Amino acid sequence: MCGRFASSTDPAELVRLFGVQQWDPTETLAPSWNVAPTAKTFAVLDRTPRGQRHPVRQLRVLRWGLVPAWASSADTAVKMINARAETVHEKPAYRQPYASRRCLI
């Protein structure tokens, strides 16, 4: 995924394919064959809800882009969208998110 991608799979199909346990069916997005950085898109992620001990696989609508830890505000930060697989675990902007906050776009 470089600068754009296509997103046309029905969310119910994503739930089935990836074993999603938590999903709000009212969160919908129109199919797009030109999803740009900072656009909303579906993401599959494992997160531990507050007060629980184990992660839950979720399908959520998120904005595509990583806000760096040093940004003072998510609204004004330049969102990063691309990392090299060979160095993602080394680069300061990606190291911590790569270790603990990954998701499938």
How would you label these PLM feature ranges?
Residues 1-104:
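Short linear sequence motif anchored by a di-proline
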